[in-house]
Every structure is written in structure tokens, then in C-alpha cells.
Amino acid sequence: MTEKNQDAVTEEQGTEVVLQIQRIYVKDVSFEAPNLPHIFQQEWKPKLDFNLSTETTHLAEDLYEVCLNISVETTMEGSEDVAFICEVKQAGIFAISGLEDVQLAHCLTSQCPNMLFPYARELISSLVNRGTFPALNLAPVNFDALFVEYMQRQQAQEESKAEEKEKKEVH
């Protein structure tokens, strides 16, 4: 595949769409195991709390930083003792051109995090392994579905605001 083909995601109305990774890096990482070593004496029945969010920063024309924030807290069922807390901020700088509005938002909140997730997942797995806990393999995340849910919530909020405004104007 040529470089031109790699950079061109799609072509719309004669405008070439470009999504190019400039750099992928770890912005922040934390691993805590506050109840070691006695947690190893308990039967391993973990309860996992997984949180995920993204942050986007416009750095320059057609240049964006996307940061994927993942937090995993594992407690023991029954005792509620914290086994470990792992937090990773995996970021990347992306050159994006040829997209506007909803398409750009989709790229920044779905396609870019989708590229970052394998790096974050591997880092979390490695940190948990170094803590000598059983393997933790995070399931893939459907960022497209999360984006659709977000857009539906935004649309519902806009419709709700429009209805409230309409009610106020009637009274």
C-alpha cells in the first residue's frame, strides 16, 4: 500500500481526507496495589470497575492531540479490599484534514481512540502482570457505538431544550 493510499481514508467531493498518526505516547500512568501483600492471601474473586473517557485538544491547523483515559479499579468480592488501581492516559498527535463538523468529531472520538486503545490495553496488562496479579485482558471497545450513543444523547438534549423553550413561549 502506498503512503498516499495509507493517508487517504476516503475521498468526498474531490477533497482528500487525511488521517495521519504523528506520534503515540504515554502521557500519564499509575499503578497502585494498596493492600499488598495480604491481598494475595485471599481467594482471587475480583470485581472490576472500568472507566474510559477521551479528551481532544486542537494544537494547530489540522493537528490534534487525542488522549484516551482508562481507569481500572479491582476490588475483592466480599471484603471490598482494593487489589489494584491502574490508570493510563495514552495519547497521540494526529494530522487530520478534509473533515468538518460531525465527521471530524467522529474521527476524534472514535477512529483516533480506536488506534490508541491497543497501546493502553497492552500497558495496563503489563502493569497488572508486574504486580504479579492474574492476567487482565481488556475486551475491545466499540468506539463507533459510543459515538452514536453520544450523538443520540446530544440530539435528545437539544430536542428537550427546544420543547422547554416552546412551552415557555406558549405561557
UniProtKB/Swiss-Prot annotation:
The biological processes this protein is annotated with in GO are: protein folding; protein tetramerization; protein transport
Binding partners and assembly: Homotetramer, a dimer of dimers. One homotetramer interacts with 1 SecA dimer.
The main location class comes to: cytoplasm
Coiled-coil region(s): none
As for what it does, the entry says: One of the proteins required for the normal export of preproteins out of the cell cytoplasm. It is a molecular chaperone that binds to a subset of precursor proteins, maintaining them in a translocation-competent state. It also specifically binds to its receptor SecA.
Q: Which PANTHER family match?
A: PROTEIN-EXPORT PROTEIN SECB, PTHR36918
Q: Does the keyword Hydrolase apply?
A: no
Keywords from the named record: Chaperone, Cytoplasm, Protein transport, Translocation, Transport
Name the protein family: Belongs to the SecB family.
CDD domains listed in its UniProt record:
Translocase_SecB (cd00557)
Question: What protein name does the entry list?
Answer: Protein-export protein SecB
Native source species: Histophilus somni (strain 129Pt)
Q: Which domain of life is it from?
A: Bacteria
What molecular functions are annotated in GO for this chain? unfolded protein binding
Gene Ontology CC annotations of this record: cytoplasm
SUPFAM superfamilies in UniProt: SecB-like (SSF54611)
